[in-house]
Design a protein with these regions (language model features):
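Peripheral, non-catalytic segments flanking oxidoreductase cores
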Residues: 1-170
Length: 170
């Protein structure tokens, strides 16, 4: 399959954690997802780490543009949070957003196992969910939510509650 060949050509490995991957584990179970990770394409040395598919320059350009736009949104969002917490200007400069420490991940949650059957020998079985519950790492996650749902937020009084998908929102 040509899609599989394209994905395996940019698969991450022990020397580079960026690129395509379909075998992540959460609590010793394989996640039912495929991911593509990259860092700021404009960052010095990024070409040594980012793995882009050959012949898909439009994909790389689109991801660069998306990274730029979401980086600006992240900075603005963190500024709003900072202001809402009543922190002073000096404090804001100490926690300033840095694109150098940012990465982007594209997640795909397929209906079935993302690993072809002929490649599953010796792999840990799939977990019960697409990925571990409430496992986003980092300071902030910007989610371009689809119409499937699955996003939750924690309420002090009611525990985890579903956030209904809203078209066009992040």
């Amino acid at each position: 399959n040509s899609d599989r060949a394209l994905k395996t050509s940019i698969t991450r490995d022990a020397t580079n954690p960026l690129g395509y991957f379909d075998r992540e584990l959460t609590k010793r179970k394989r996640d039912n997802k495929e991911v593509f990770d990259f860092v700021d394409p404009s960052r010095e040395g990024a070409d040594e780490f980012n793995r882009w598919p050959d012949g898909l320059r439009d994909f790389r350009d689109a991801m660069t543009s998306l990274f730029d736009g979401l980086s600006m949104l992240t900075e603005r969002t963190l500024g709003v949070i900072h202001g809402a917490l009543g922190l002073g200007k000096d404090s804001r400069e100490q926690v300033a957003f840095s694109r150098l420490s940012s990465s982007m991940r594209l997640n795909h949650y397929p209906v079935g196992d993302p690993v072809p059957e002929n490649e599953r020998t010796g792999l840990v079985g799939l977990g019960e969910t697409a990925l571990g519950y409430h496992t986003d790492p980092g300071v902030i996650t910007l989610l371009l939510q689809d119409d499937v749902g699955g996003l939750q937020t924690e309420s002090r009084d009611h525990g985890w509650i579903d956030v209904p998908p809203q078209p066009g929102t992040i």
